[in-house]
A protein has these predicted regions:
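Short glycine/acidic-enriched loop and turn motifs that connect beta-strands
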Residues: 57-58, 131-132, 175-179
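Beta-propeller domains
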Residues: 59-95, 126-151
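Bacterial signal peptide processing site
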Residues: 23-25
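Short, conserved, GDST-rich strand-edge loop motifs in beta-rich repeat architectures
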Residues: 36-48, 109-112, 121, 171-188
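C-terminal motif of bacterial Sec signal peptides marking the signal peptidase cleavage site
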Residues: 18-21
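Conserved beta-propeller blade signature
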Residues: 49-52, 123-126, 168-170
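Repeated scaffold domains used in trafficking and secretory/extracellular systems
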Residues: 37-39, 82-87, 103-115, 152-162
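Asp-box/WD-like beta-propeller blade repeats and closely related beta-sheet repeat scaffolds
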Residues: 139-188
Length: 188
């Protein structure tokens, strides 16, 4: 009986000792280094924002840097039941193509709008890789404002490219498609 009491007492003392040894000496020890450099307090703004293509999800993600916080996932080329994207009368027509309703695509590259060659933060453009489409996402609302289908194009992988005042969004293609001169230019 005495042995069990001594063993229990030693076990409790060991646990208390371990718990005390794990505490930092002061609170500043726990928050120095690289983690502190990336910390952005609640209510404060990140210095940069990263607009990341979602690939096969067809969505655009917005992250704050340096915090790494995910601020929003914007549906672009795919339906999103959570946000109603692609289901209501306002957004469903945006997913129509000349081949019918295409409720999915591979959002690949993004490009920011520019004024005098400087990024102005009005819009983000993104290309669809599977169908020849480019989307314009409005950065005032963080919603897809427009999707256009590109004539004479297939496999729109490498674009969009923006002119210095965003007058034109230029698309690159991997496959040639015969020209359709009757439709002409597509304004943004």
């Amino acid at each position: 009986m005495k042995t069990k009491f001594v063993q229990a007492t030693l076990a409790v003392a060991l646990v208390i000792g371990l718990m005390q040894s794990c505490k930092p000496k002061n609170s500043s020890d726990a928050s120095v280094g690289d983690a502190e450099k990336a910390y952005v307090a609640p209510g404060k703004y990140d210095e940069f924002y990263n607009f990341v293509s979602g690939g096969f999800s067809g969505q655009l993600s917005v992250y704050g840097l340096p915090s790494g916080r995910l601020f929003r996932v914007i549906p672009v080329f795919s339906v999103d039941p959570e946000k109603g994207w692609g289901y209501n009368e306002e957004t469903k027509p945006m997913l129509n193509t000349s081949h019918g309703f295409v409720p999915w695509d591979d959002l690949h590259h993004t490009e920011m709008s520019q004024t005098n060659g400087e990024v102005d933060g009005r819009w983000v453009f993104g290309n669809a890789n599977n169908t020849p489409r480019i989307a314009r996402i409005d950065l005032k609302t963080f919603k897809t404002a427009e999707i256009i289908e590109l004539p004479n194009s297939g496999g729109n992988h490498s674009s969009p490219f923006i002119t210095e005042n965003t007058e034109y969004v230029v698309a690159g293609t991997r496959f040639s498609v015969p020209a359709d001169y009757s439709n002409g230019d597509v304004a943004i």
